């Protein structure tokens, strides 16, 4: 039986601005997304029977049709029934390293890896654009997870404009295992508190989305100026999440106070918080200091870095 092993990186938001509502119930967003080298491993094996099996080493991750990984495989079966009949089903194993329900696109990047893996397994020859379009039907972050690197994302997050990739900005990432923030709750509360500021006119929305391309954070990214990037981190959802989750606020403040940290922010709807550092040694020192200050085993702390790619194939059999 043929098989592929893939690496599925997590993402952080360097910028997240909510600019309006969409007719489909989502929000109009302006984001800058960044791949990091904290990643899950996905193994995909072909099966002789026309079935889908999903396995995962993390007890919180379901392996039924509620899992985005399963739905990604199901999507490929639906779109390419002849290939499914010819090549058979798939057995998918997810080795989780990315924290679950953390605002790091763990589920989305796993789904992206399944799309890439099945494309290879069934010899479909899909382009990256075609894979991104398939991914957009599964979730807003999936197209980015296929592409990876450093990207401006607009619409609900599926319209991507690549930026020069950032490599080797070091990151300390913290997340309480037992703490989850509902993405739907965060956006709903933001709408309730700040919906009056939303842009309504289609041209205004398009202009605001386009404006980020000439903004100061994009200039800093193009110039690979880590300090300038760190000074321009922005996430609208912090306005509703931080007041409601004091643990997240405290962790953010603690990270921000550490020597060597050049910027701190919550990723996505949280509860993950990250700090940017210019060197690995600084990041490791910050991790050690925060661990001493908060010895709670419920707090996961990672040292990671920015990377230039999305899904990677690392083995086949």
UniProtKB/Swiss-Prot annotation:
Source species: Nostoc sp. (strain PCC 7120 / SAG 25.82 / UTEX 2576)
GO biological process, one term: terpenoid biosynthetic process
Family: Belongs to the GHMP kinase family. IspE subfamily.
Active-site residue numbers: 11, 141
Name this polypeptide is given: 4-diphosphocytidyl-2-C-methyl-D-erythritol kinase
Pathway given in the UniProt record: Isoprenoid biosynthesis; isopentenyl diphosphate biosynthesis via DXP pathway; isopentenyl diphosphate from 1-deoxy-D-xylulose 5-phosphate: step 3/6
Matching HAMAP family: IspE (MF_00061)
Residues at which ATP binds: 99-109
Domain of life: Bacteria
Keyword list, A-Z: ATP-binding, Isoprene biosynthesis, Kinase, Nucleotide-binding, Transferase
Reactions this protein catalyses: 4-CDP-2-C-methyl-D-erythritol + ATP = 4-CDP-2-C-methyl-D-erythritol 2-phosphate + ADP + H(+)
Pfam families: GHMP_kinases_C, GHMP_kinases_N
Known EC number: 2.7.1.148
Gene designation per UniProt: ispE
Lineage: Bacteria, Bacillati, Cyanobacteriota, Cyanophyceae, Nostocales
Task of the protein: Catalyzes the phosphorylation of the position 2 hydroxy group of 4-diphosphocytidyl-2C-methyl-D-erythritol.
UniProt GO MF annotations: 4-(cytidine 5'-diphospho)-2-C-methyl-D-erythritol kinase activity; ATP binding
